[in-house]
């Protein structure tokens, strides 16, 4: 269905109004035939009056619209997650084999964390109203949320590890140069003596 979520929700509200109208008209019609209100209410679901038939049709339309809304939300969520996953993969593919600057590490992991946080937000938004979702759909959303949350925390840990590793390499390089200069200076002093 190409309708937007707002259009589907508008149709749902109109269908609810139709259900209520047809139900009340059917009850009224059955009561004018001599049924008690309780009998009339019970008879609406299987009666042959035009209002009973319209009521059942509106009920089915309502269920179909709820299915359309659920399908729309699931498809939209899937598309958003897929887009973010593709961006994460592109970012991962552009990651250098070896870091040169701390600012490169910070930039990479800031971008990665932003994309992962966006994934978490998409899952959280999808889980705000699960009343029309199946248990399997809810489980998939919760699993996705858990994976994205774990990946977000791992990105923060990896950023710290990569920064620490680069700083250690830079420190080792500085110590090596200092020792090299110290040896050269000692050789020069020995040559002067």
Over which residues does each language-model region extend?
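Residue positions that define the register of long amphipathic alpha-helical repeats
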Residues: 1-193
């Amino acid at each position: 269905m190409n309708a937007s979520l707002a259009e589907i929700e508008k149709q749902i509200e109109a269908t609810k109004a139709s259900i209520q109208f047809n139900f009340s008209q059917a009850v009224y019609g059955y009561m004018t035939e001599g049924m008690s209100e309780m009998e009339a209410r019970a008879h609406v679901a299987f009666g042959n009056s035009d209002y009973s038939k319209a009521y059942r049709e509106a009920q089915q339309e309502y269920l179909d619209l709820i299915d359309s809304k659920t399908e729309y939300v699931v498809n939209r969520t899937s598309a958003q997650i897929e887009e973010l996953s593709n961006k994460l993969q592109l970012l991962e593919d552009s990651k250098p084999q070896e870091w040169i600057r701390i600012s490169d590490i910070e930039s990479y992991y800031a971008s990665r964390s932003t994309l992962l946080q966006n994934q978490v937000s998409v899952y959280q938004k999808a889980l705000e109203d699960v009343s029309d979702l199946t248990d399997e759909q809810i489980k998939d959303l919760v699993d996705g949320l858990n994976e994205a949350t774990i990946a977000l925390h791992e990105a923060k840990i990896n950023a710290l590890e990569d920064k620490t590793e680069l700083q250690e390499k830079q420190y080792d390089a500085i110590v090596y140069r200092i020792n090299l200069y110290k040896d050269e200076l000692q050789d020069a002093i020995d040559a002067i003596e």
